[in-house]
């Protein structure tokens, strides 16, 4: 059932809230929580919809800060009724995958644990390590996150030595393959010396390794090697033999060997305190530990069973059925374990058991997982203590009324005024929060080639960042992204420019601002002619330096990106009828000017917005008669 989207939130209109709750049935199903813009904040499931949704708005119900923030934004509730709990779980999983709501991530986005990504969306997919899961293309596959980064890098290194794979994001040469092809590390995808089908077949074998199916892959390769030998194709047989040896070496390097190698199983456990919750999931295949995944969750969100239930739902939502093990070992019963087991069975195509182990070998495995979860918790607490110490020290140095929960850092990057850009980075509780980072293109016409003006650029950025607070000061109290401290990369001049703008906007009292100069690591405060006397090794100063360095890095990388885009577009600007929008479409499709130059008329016409006549203009520009 779907309702109308209204501007007032439900907690501001209790009559409408109560009427809305009465409309929701006491049946299994899926519910949607929307904000005033109609965006889905959260998708959930329940065997009793009304009871579950009402719990969010019950005054006596304790909510974590994250969930409380979500509830304050809810303006509408929608729901879909299902026949069974299993149906609601399957529907919830599909809807979350489709809409990716902001508050549906129980697991925190911790960048220290990397993933393996295979870009199946590309004609010749790449495989690489990344610390961020992107949802731009549903065809791409992510495996992980992996706790042991060194082992992961070694594994990928060994795989690339065993199987010929694409090595570069872009070709090194446009008319010939690079050295990787000559030494057998790459099949020459840049020159299309292998068909996409054959290349994908190779990559499917690699994917089996990260799915925990190395034993199955070894059996397949052994069969192929025997067939090649019988057909007198000894070169192919030798290639497969080398691949088998590489995989066997990889298998030997696994650190833990376990009995009962006939069953694939995952074992999960957590360790938590009032502030932190660390989850470890060990993947055991053919009696060997092939993967160790780590997750962080909101420790205030639920009890142990509820957290584990949600973690498993989120984890197995992102994996293929063939990757789901036959058995999952748990430290406790799950609140909806039967529903989860039914959903996993449907996805895998065979029975999946959720077990609280009684046998000694399984209990020992689970104890090892719990021990690792506790170790990660202690490590996280030590890191949090260091961050807290830095914040406390910084508050003392700058005489702040409270700890700076949100710190923002700003920097300008340009080359003699050309392509001037700015960065805005954010640190939450002393930790970089790159999901809140922002780029700014400087629009001031006085900032141009040959005339750089960092002061004017910073003034423009600060004016744009705080405009909505100057227009309506009430926004400050209602905002969840107003900074406790603003750090400017620069000296007294840069700080004075920012202070002047904040004064014009009547925000000088509300915005605490400092600057940090690079040369001597000097900290300047508004109204002070001399820098603060500090020790560069103080925790608070080191935190400011991290913010400053991150703002600088982010600004420089964006400036470099803008220069590259401008240099590519400069040639395209000369083509009649090719505007900015179609230039973007061309570059998005072909990725480089060289590929556009080499494209045929038919290939050019495949680009969105490029008709026959414009394709001829582009082709003739690069191929003059």
From Swiss-Prot:
Q: Which GO terms describe its cellular component?
A: cytoplasm; excinuclease repair complex
Q: Which Pfam families match?
A: GIY-YIG, HHH_2, UVR, UvrC_RNaseH, UvrC_RNaseH_dom
Q: Where in the cell is it found?
A: Cytoplasm
Instruction: Keywords in alphabetical order, please.
Output: Cytoplasm, DNA damage, DNA excision, DNA repair, Excision nuclease, SOS response
In this protein, which residues make up the domain named UVR?
Answer: 215-250
Q: One MF term from GO for this chain? A: excinuclease ABC activity
| Protein name per Swiss-Prot or TrEMBL | UvrABC system protein C
Q: Where is the GIY-YIG domain?
A: 26-105
What family does this chain come from, according to its entry? Belongs to the UvrC family.
InterPro entries per the record? DisA/LigA_HHH (IPR041663), GIY-YIG_endonuc (IPR000305), GIY-YIG_endonuc_sf (IPR035901), GIY-YIG_UvrC_Cho (IPR047296), Hlx-hairpin-Hlx_DNA-bd_motif (IPR003583), RuvA_2-like (IPR010994), UVR_dom (IPR001943), UVR_dom_sf (IPR036876)
Q: Which HAMAP family match?
A: UvrC
Species in which this protein is naturally found = Microcystis aeruginosa (strain NIES-843 / IAM M-2473)
**Quaternary structure annotation from Swiss-Prot or TrEMBL:** Interacts with UvrB in an incision complex.
**The protein's role, per its UniProt record:** The UvrABC repair system catalyzes the recognition and processing of DNA lesions. UvrC both incises the 5' and 3' sides of the lesion. The N-terminal half is responsible for the 3' incision and the C-terminal half is responsible for the 5' incision.
Instruction: Extract one GO BP annotation from the record.
Output: nucleotide-excision repair
């Amino acid at each position: 059932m779907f309702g109308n989207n209204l501007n007032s939130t439900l907690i501001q209109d209790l009559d409408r809230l109560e009427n809305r709750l009465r409309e929701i049935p006491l049946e299994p199903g899926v519910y949607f929580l929307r904000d005033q813009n109609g965006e889905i904040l959260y998708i959930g499931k329940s065997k009793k919809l009304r009871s579950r949704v009402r719990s969010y708005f019950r005054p006596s119900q304790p909510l974590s800060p994250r969930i409380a923030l979500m509830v304050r934004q809810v303006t509408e509730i929608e729901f879909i009724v299902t026949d069974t709990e299993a149906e609601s779980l399957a529907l919830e999983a599909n809807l979350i995958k489709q809409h990716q709501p902001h508050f549906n991530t129980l697991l925190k986005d911790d960048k220290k644990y990397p993933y393996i990504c295979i870009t199946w969306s590309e004609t010749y997919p790449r495989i690489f390590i990344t610390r961020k899961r992107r949802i731009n293309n549903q065809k791409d596959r992510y495996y992980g996150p992996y706790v042991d980064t060194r082992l992961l890098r070694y594994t990928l290194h060994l795989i690339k030595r065993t199987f010929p794979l694409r090595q570069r994001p872009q070709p090194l040469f446009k008319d010939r393959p690079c050295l990787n092809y000559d030494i057998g590390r790459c099949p020459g995808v840049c020159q299309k010396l292998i068909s996409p089908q054959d290349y994908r077949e190779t990559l499917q074998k690699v994917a089996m390794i990260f799915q925990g199916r190395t034993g199955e892959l070894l059996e397949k390769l052994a069969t192929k090697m025997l067939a090649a030998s019988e057909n007198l194709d000894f070169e192919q047989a030798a290639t497969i033999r080398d691949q088998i040896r590489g995989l066997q070496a990889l298998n030997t390097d696994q650190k833990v060997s376990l009995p009962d190698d006939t069953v694939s199983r995952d074992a999960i456990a957590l360790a938590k305190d009032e502030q932190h919750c660390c989850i470890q999931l060990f993947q055991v295949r053919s009696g060997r530990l092939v993967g160790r995944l780590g997750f962080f969750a909101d420790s205030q969100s639920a009890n142990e069973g509820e957290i584990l239930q949600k973690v498993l739902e989120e984890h197995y939502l992102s994996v293929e059925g063939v990757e789901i093990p036959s058995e999952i070992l748990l430290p406790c019963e799950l609140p909806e374990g039967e529903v989860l087991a039914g959903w996993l069975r449907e996805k895998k195509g065979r029975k999946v058991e959720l077990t609280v182990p009684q046998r000694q070998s399984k209990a020992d495995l689970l104890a090892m997982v719990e021990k690792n979860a506790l170790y990660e918790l202690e490590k996280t607490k030590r890191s949090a203590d260091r961050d807290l110490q830095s914040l406390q020290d910084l508050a003392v140095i700058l005489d702040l009324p409270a700890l700076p929960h949100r710190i923002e850092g700003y920097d300008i990057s340009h080359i003699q005024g050309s392509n001037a850009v700015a960065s805005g980075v954010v640190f939450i509780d002393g930790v970089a929060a790159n999901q809140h980072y922002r780029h700014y293109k400087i629009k001031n016409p006085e900032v141009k080639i040959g005339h750089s003006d960092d002061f004017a650029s910073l003034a423009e950025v600060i004016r744009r960042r705080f405009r909505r607070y100057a227009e309506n000061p009430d926004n400050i109290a209602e905002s969840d992204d107003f900074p406790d401290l603003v750090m400017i990369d620069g000296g007294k001049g840069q700080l004075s420019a920012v202070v002047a703008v904040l004064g014009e906007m009547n925000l000088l009292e509300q915005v605490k601002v400092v600057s940090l100069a690079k040369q001597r690591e000097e900290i300047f405060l508004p109204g002070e002619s001399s820098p603060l006397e500090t020790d560069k090794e103080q925790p608070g100063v080191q935190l400011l330096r991290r913010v400053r360095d991150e703002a600088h890095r982010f600004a420089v990388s964006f400036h470099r990106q803008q220069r590259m885009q401008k240099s590519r577009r400069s040639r395209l600007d000369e083509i009649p009828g090719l505007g900015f929008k179609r230039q973007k479409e061309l570059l998005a499709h072909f990725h480089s000017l060289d590929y556009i130059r080499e494209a045929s008329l038919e290939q050019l016409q495949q680009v969105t917005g490029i008709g026959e006549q414009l394709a001829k203009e582009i082709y003739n520009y690069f191929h003059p008669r």
